[in-house]
């Protein structure tokens, strides 16, 4: 049996403040660090051991991965970081409060920006500090590939080449891999693995720091997928994610 575990980072400071984060490099909150450690504990108690790990260029994912590997005593395994696993770029929405944005534009429009498949928010300008082209960490990435806004479709377009060429083929010679990334980059991978339609993907909300396990047979055919944890608690946390784009009553 082969396994890949997908893990969204722990709560970030902007998750706590209910702000659109995207490619903004926001740190974990105190709660987020605790969530990451608990995810590592849950994986250890369930007997998981990883041979390699993958994450984004953003510290909230990197630090979550470090917490998990520390709990597993696997700090030494190979780790690859890539911009392709970054969160969806939210364009001009980055930094705005989601509830306040829902008051201004309506909950339906915010839901479309957050969860639709092919609608992107307005892009940031070329000289805007939110443009990844202004960030030295992306100096090696062609400017034409760096987004100034993205839909989920756009996000999948940059995630999938890395998934298909790097991560998934690694299962041919490794048995267990860990991917720590972001809500939308992981939603794209899950959409691909489970064959979720462009319409139904809007209903998928990933809670922070809950391991999502995918098991494959020796032919790399998906045979089982499940969250690791208490189903009722996970359901409530996913519902809380869905409500982030609602106006405060």
Swiss-Prot record:
Keywords: Gluconeogenesis, Glycolysis, Isomerase. It comes from the Bacteria. Pathway: Carbohydrate degradation; glycolysis; pyruvate from D-glyceraldehyde 3-phosphate: step 3/5. It is an enzyme of class 5 (isomerase). Coiled coil: none annotated. The record marks 182 as: Transition state stabilizer. GO terms for biological process: gluconeogenesis; glycolytic process. One of its GO terms (molecular function) is phosphoglycerate mutase activity. InterPro entries: His_Pase_superF_clade-1, His_PPase_superfam, PG/BPGM_mutase_AS, Phosphogly_mut1. The keyword Isomerase applies. Catalyzes the interconversion of 2-phosphoglycerate and 3-phosphoglycerate. This is 2,3-bisphosphoglycerate-dependent phosphoglycerate mutase 1. The gene is gpmA1.
């Amino acid at each position: 049996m082969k396994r890949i575990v997908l893990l969204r980072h722990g709560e970030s400071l902007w998750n706590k403040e209910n702000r659109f984060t995207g490619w903004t490099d926001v740190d974990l909150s105190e709660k987020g660090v605790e969530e990451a450690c608990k995810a590592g504990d849950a994986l250890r108690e369930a007997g998981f051991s990883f041979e390699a790990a993958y994450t984004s260029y953003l510290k909230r994912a990197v630090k979550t991965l470090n917490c998990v590997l520390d709990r597993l005593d696997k700090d030494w395994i190979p780790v690859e970081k890539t911009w392709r696993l970054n969160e969806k770029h939210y364009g001009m929405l980055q930094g705005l409060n989601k509830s306040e944005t829902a008051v201004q534009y309506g909950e339906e429009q915010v839901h479309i920006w957050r969860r639709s498949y092919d609608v992107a928010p307005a892009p940031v300008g070329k000289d805007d500090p939110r443009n990844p082209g202004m960030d030295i960490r992306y100096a090696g990435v062609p400017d034409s590939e760096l987004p100034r806004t993205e839909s989920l479709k756009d996000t999948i377009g940059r995630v999938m080449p890395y998934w298909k060429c790097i991560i998934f083929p690694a299962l041919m010679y490794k048995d267990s891999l860990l991917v720590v990334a972001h809500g939308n980059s992981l939603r794209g991978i899950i959409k691909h693995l489970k064959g979720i339609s462009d319409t139904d993907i809007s209903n998928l909300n990933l809670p922070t720091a809950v391991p999502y396990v995918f098991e494959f047979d020796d032919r790399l055919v998906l045979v089982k997928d499940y969250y690791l944890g208490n189903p009722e608690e996970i359901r409530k946390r996913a519902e809380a994610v869905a409500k982030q784009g609602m106006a405060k009553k």
